[in-house]
Amino acid sequence: MRPCIWIHVHLKPPCRLVELLPFSSALQGLSHLSLGTTLPVILPERNEEQNLQELSHNADKYQMGDCCKEEIDDSIFY
């Protein structure tokens, strides 16, 4: 079973919705997120440090343009 983390999505004004990239099977069926939504992300590695590196180095995969900013360090809960 892959580890699951929760990422809190912060939207910059005036955006109120953000479209998700289909990077996670856990997000299938969710096309939009509202302001302040918390969502699960399934990561490929079991190792927590590798997961953090994956999020940090590939942050563009987990957001859409300038509309969405994820506070990675403060929002990961195993």
Curated annotation (Swiss-Prot):
Function: May act as a tumor suppressor.
Name by which UniProt lists this protein: Leukemia-associated protein 1
Domain of life: Eukaryota
Keyword terms of this UniProt record: Tumor suppressor
